[in-house]
Amino acid sequence: ERVEAAGRDAEALCEALAALEEDFTRITDTASQRAKDSGTAPNRSLVHSDTRRSATARIGGTVLDAMAPLDPLMTSAAWLMGRLGARVEQRAVEVYEKLSAASGEERVNLADFWFASMPILHGGAVTDAQEVLAEFQRRWARIIPLPEGEARVRASHSAVASQVAEAFPPVPVAWSAARYLSPDVLIAARDTGAIGRGDFELVLGELHLASNTMGASLFVSQHPEPAELLRLTGRDHPGPRLLPLLPKEHKARLSTRVRNVLVRPEDYYVALMELTADPHRDRTVLSADAHVVRRDGRPVVVLPGGAEFPVTDVFGHVLTTLAMDMFQLFPDADHVPRVMVDKLVVSRESWRFTGGELGFA
């Protein structure tokens, strides 16, 4: 309360922060700030301040129409996630069969299954991601060839869309978060007037896979209508979800600012390693109380109340971590040209070199 009351008064804010840290250390006998390392979340102090710009940007139909080439990109991204999920699920089947054979039981305890899957999630699944991406890029190379020495390559949305539909057929959603795609799109124009005249280009910065950026705590907490975001989440997921609880520390260096908070009362949490949810929250399940069985040849998780979910949902965070930055249309090379589909730059021009190749180095 004292920190909040200090507002923009720098001197009062420093005093309030110092007092808070002193109280925390006295009560917990723990340092109020943590040292930065590979396993420490970005936010290492007790409190932080988030702000929202007062400016509001609105875009019209002209800009939205120019975003149409995102559609075939997203179609191919869905294929990419589906293939990755299918590969990991097949590895999960092998783990299940091994544990089931060893115990002589059709039901395998989820806690045992999770720990037996560790070599897959941090080994085989990484290889799967690399191989699936390589195939993804081979298919895109046939859709948009990159002539050697060219600085600019152009293609039309209609031509690309028809080829993408053939090269990347629909696949089932592999895990619940794989419904989401979060593109970062920049507008390149001299000024707002130029945009109105249609004199602009769009640039795809990144296309994040299996992640709803708007679900991050820092966005939800500052959104004018968080309830609306939860309502829309219900449209994306008409039924309950099974969400793995994240450990207190994670090598991905997650923080309270970016954790997904669009979680509804009907969603289930499963504690795989640490129980980091509200201990009084309903629908929080310990992995030791759940089981893995096969349904129509596919592994599913059965919760104590009888609810069932694809086993890939248990791996959801690991799969999202693998997939989030996978989207790359063309492999790295000494030179990759700028590739445009209509008004959208889908791949920016890039160069790769070593220091020894540079005359001034």
Predicted stretch roles:
Residues 1-236:
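Type-3 copper protein
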Residues 124-125, 135-361:
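Acidic, serine/proline-rich low-complexity intrinsically disordered regions
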